[in-house]
Each structure stands twice: as structure tokens, then as C-alpha cells.
């Protein structure tokens, strides 16, 4: 399926100079959303995944249906102050600012094979931080899946040594 026809291009969002790739049209089309989910599920099945991890918020949109289809758990990665129990944290930079990400300390057991999902790979800051959280808990990053990669931002360099699936590139 050509997923690009289901991704809207929004200039100057969330701030001037950023060209945002909006996946909500893909989510609004049940067949396209299912096809994207199915492609990631097939990728994950080859990697013997124990848990899916996704950073908020769009990583949830991708990761939850994948974890459901695989019949494995989903562990959310959230901004500081959004998870109610004991967490580990990591500072990170992203395309348009800096922030802190967290995950529950008990979200991943040592040795578990993890699939990280997110909507978009831009500069790689969010995914690099998510990898650090997973690995600090002893998880093994068995795969990383994105709907979209912005190749001109060179975020892929953060992922050397990791197995990556991207459905569409810009």
C-alpha cells in the first residue's frame, strides 16, 4: 500500500520552519491503518517480541494495536510526571526542543525482547532516549518500527546497529 497518500503535509507546525507529517488521515482510513499495523506485526513476528514500547503519544497509536495483535504487553514511555509509579528517566533533544522521558521501572524485565514503535523518525532524539530507557532496564531492542522517516534530518545515524523498519520515507 502507498501509505504516503494517507499522510498529510502540514507546513509550519508546530512552529515555523517545521514541515509536519500528520498520520491522522492514515488512522482515519481503517484499511490503511490496518495495513500499516499488519506490516509492523509481520516484521515483529520475525523477531520473537516479548513487549512493545512506544513513546507518547503517537507511539501509543502504533504500538498498542501491534501489541494486541502479537498478544504481548505494551509499555508506554511518557514525559516526566505522567506515570504514577516509580520510573527511570532520560533527558533528550528532539526536532523542536528538549524534554525528559520516563518509563516504569518494572515495565521491562531483563532479557525481554522489545519492539519500539513510533510514528516518525526525525532527528532520532526521541528514539535514542527510548532505547536508553529500554536498555537501562535490561531489555533487548529486537526491532524498531516507524510509519515515516524524514531522511533529510539524518535521525537514522542514531540507530546504527539496530534493526529498523520504515514504511514510508521523505
From Swiss-Prot:
CDD domains: PRTases_typeI. Its EC number is 2.4.2.7. Its main location: cytoplasm. GO terms for biological process: adenine salvage; AMP salvage; purine ribonucleoside salvage. GO terms for cellular component: cytoplasm. Pathway: Purine metabolism; AMP biosynthesis via salvage pathway; AMP from adenine: step 1/1. It catalyses: AMP + diphosphate = 5-phospho-alpha-D-ribose 1-diphosphate + adenine. Gene3D superfamilies: 3.40.50.2020. PANTHER family: ADENINE PHOSPHORIBOSYLTRANSFERASE. This is Adenine phosphoribosyltransferase.
